[in-house]
Amino acid sequence: MPSFDVVNKVEMQELDNAVNNVKKEVDTRYDFRNSVTEIELHRGDKRIHLLAGDEMKMRALQDMLQSHCIRRKVDPKCLEFKDIEPTSKGQVKRDVVIQEGITKDVAQKIVKKIKDSKLKVQAAIQDDQVRVTGKKIDDLQEVIQLLRGEEFGVPLQFVNMKA
């Protein structure tokens, strides 16, 4: 039976490239001169650490990160910005968590949406992905179009299309 998987994966190399591009832009921008500004990608625990001189620079850094992610085809919805925290040196820091995988709640919403569509397909939650199977590839393509039209709060990719 034809099937495909609905997943949420982040291309870490592209995210690394986006972070490096932000670092280069910070080095060349006039408003970041003579201020401490850091951006680091921690691949192991899937987070980005931001450090800036004040909240205005932090917002600018956040905007740059989001725009560079868009340029590198990384969906900024996978970035969860935590609260801005002051440091002891009068600066501000912020952690950005990189969300990968589909949570149980989102997976249940996806399955419910597929079942409500009355298409002849089955959806099953498997760890951090949703497997959709059906008899016809056309039905599976309709499901893909249906899910692309909805907003689930996480970017969705459709992989492993097997006929």
UniProtKB/Swiss-Prot annotation:
GO annotations of cellular component type: cytosol
Entries under Pfam families matching the protein: DUF520
Database matches in Gene3D superfamilies: 3.30.70.860, YajQ-like, domain 2
Keywords of this entry: Nucleotide-binding
Keyword Nucleotide-binding: yes
Organism domain of life: Bacteria
Keyword Nucleotide-binding among record annotations: yes
Cited InterPro entries: DUF520, UPF0234-like_C, UPF0234_N, YajQ-like_sf
Signal peptide limits: none
HAMAP family: YajQ (MF_00632)
Function: Nucleotide-binding protein.
Similarity-based family: Belongs to the YajQ family.
PANTHER family named in the record: UPF0234 PROTEIN YAJQ (PTHR30476:SF0)
Name of the protein in its database record: Nucleotide-binding protein DvMF_3058
Organismal lineage: Bacteria, Pseudomonadati, Thermodesulfobacteriota, Desulfovibrionia, Desulfovibrionales
